[in-house]
Design a protein with these regions (language model features):
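Membrane-embedded catalytic scaffold of the fatty acid hydroxylase/desaturase
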Residues: 1-63, 71-78, 82-138
Length: 138
């Protein structure tokens, strides 16, 4: 599953949406920004094996929490990633938090920086922890 999503995301998405031009222009571009529905379903199905193991050890609540957390993360990722690619003048695009996170994501779209800086699309926390936030002068 990962190679399919990577092959679609890296060459297409990063070629079309560049650092200073990340806004979608047409609703048909949703396919370039969002994970395909089958990808979401595959992610959900991949959570079921660990959940089944947890369930087998009488940890049903933990199993449900695991699936809910994984899917919550994926849906949050999708919503935030979409919001970064909406026009900056849209209602969502004007939200302060979205604006700040869009700037962080724009560095990820710079071809000279994307392999080294700003990997986390949803929340820069792990970029901060791992030291992969791009220096301010970039």
């Amino acid at each position: 599953m990962a190679p399919v999503l990577y092959d679609r995301h890296t060459p297409e998405h990063h070629m079309i949406y560049v650092t200073h031009d990340m806004a979608m222009r047409d609703r048909r571009e949703f396919r370039l920004v969002l994970i395909p529905a089958y990808g979401i379903m595959l992610i959900f199905l991949s959570t079921l094996i660990p959940a089944a193991v947890l369930w087998a050890f009488s940890l049903a609540n933990v199993a449900c929490l695991f699936v809910a957390t994984a899917m919550g993360y994926v849906l949050t990722y999708e919503w935030l990633h979409l919001s970064y690619h909406l026009p900056p003048e849209s209602f969502i695009g004007r939200l302060r938090l979205v604006s700040v996170l869009r700037h962080h994501h724009a560095v990820h779209h710079d071809p000279t920086l994307m392999q080294r800086w700003n990997f986390n699309v949803t929340v820069p926390l792990w970029d901060w922890v791992r030291g992969t936030i791009a220096p301010r002068d970039r």
